[in-house]
């Protein structure tokens, strides 16, 4: 599901929202989540999962073009850990074929 599909589904589910307002709501939420992660905070959405940061230590890598060894610096990367309810729901539906264009009604 893309951001625009999420906006469209939000506008469909809540008819009082025009598409512009739904887009603003989704953008505001994603911006707040991005800011929280950028500032080192953890985000927990009960029943869905949590977003946090994982530390990747520095290491010696290799330039694939020249073969030269290079130092890859330490970095922090976003990480999503699904909650129990989401894991169970995905597991229940794991045997069903994937629907390429169908929107999930239970968002």
Swiss-Prot record:
InterPro entries: Hist_DNA-bd, IHF-like_DNA-bd_dom_sf, IHF_beta. GO terms for cellular component: chromosome; cytosol. Residues 56-107 are annotated as: Disordered. One of its GO terms (molecular function) is structural constituent of chromatin. Keywords: DNA recombination, DNA-binding, Transcription, Transcription regulation, Translation regulation. The keyword Transcription applies. Pfam families: Bac_DNA_binding (PF00216). One of its GO terms (biological process) is regulation of translation. Residues 65-107 have a biased composition (Basic and acidic residues). NCBIfam families: hip (TIGR00988), PRK00199.1 (NF001222). Heterodimer of an alpha and a beta chain. This protein is one of the two subunits of integration host factor, a specific DNA-binding protein that functions in genetic recombination as well as in transcriptional and translational control. Belongs to the bacterial histone-like protein family. This is Integration host factor subunit beta.
